Amino acid sequence: MLTLDKIYHAKFVLKQVARKTDLIAATRLCPGTDLYLKTENLQVTGSFKVRGAYYKISQLSAEERAKGVIACSAGNHAQGVALAATRMGIKSVVCMPDGAPIMKVESTKRLGAEVELVKGTYDDAHDRAVELQEQTGMTFIHPYDDELVIAGQGTIGLEILDQLPDVDAVIVPIGGGGLISGVAFAIKSLRPEVKIYGVQAAGAPSMEHAFHDHKYETLDSAVTFADGIVVKTPGETTFDMVSQYVDEIVTVSEDEIAAAILALMENQKLVAEGAGATPVAAALFGKLPLAGKKTVCLISGGNIDVNILSRVITRGLVMSGRKTNLMIALEDKPGQLSLVSDIVSACGANVVSVHHDRSDANMAITSCFLKLGLETRDAAQIETIKQKLTEAGFKLVTERA
């Protein structure tokens, strides 16, 4: 049974490996909201996961340590297990889905773990890890549905109360539920009036469904670029704790997560992975009642794969009205492009790409489609450009991001 004493013990044990991450005021992120960021993206291994993994492994018996540990993970828990096991001189094996970010796979190997890539999702990697555990007798280090792991994650709750004693609300990402279970238990045990909100990706809302349906259930599929929270089945222990200690769970879209990542980079100079940005997405897009509340967004990790970061930034620019593509029907005669360019320039936008299309079957023989890629200030400027083009007699055929 999880107790507050166990979380305090985890805090003592973790002093030798995990850092007390900064809690910073997000003064430029969400005007009108008293927002703070708990920067677990700056934690050892770039994620909160080292807390639970290290505390769990530290409590193993000598016999268990001799046999080694095994885990399954999309990346962050893998790195936490690898680091903890290596520091204690214990063999570690980690099963990871084959779609896990290359950066996380390679980092796990560098930290000393033996990695086995498993075709499919996290759940498939979990099944393989359980199979290997039964064959080898190694201790399975569950990423979230384990009391000691939850206790380790709960140390973040103690730190938040220490760093911001008058906090009113905390927003926490949810995958399997280990992080929010520990944080909620710690905070509610000491300050029961503090609101604890959870956030999931709309494409992987396993705990959100279970929470609102009041029953433990499994999704048919879970798809999101926020790989750290792609879980089809929440934990049984965590579901019970979330049902008891969490006040509300909401979901955010892929575009909203991308916009939050961009906002954190531009306004706070912080790099967050998809999962870590979900609390900020919930705040930015008004998913929760935060007015008048001192609110902490828990940035759970910063291990985003650079191969997808550029796409995420592009999506974030589109969501924030900083980038758009327009398609305009033109008469195919000299001077038309110049007229369009003058209008765009007068509105203060920047043309970054131009393409003429004379082959579309839907256009008149004497016409062409002009496709423009624009850099803009915001959504209002985009609307002004459209209005000016329409007033000048140009027809906007379609618009694509």
Feature annotation, model-predicted:
Residues 1-401:
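PLP-dependent amino-acid enzyme catalytic core
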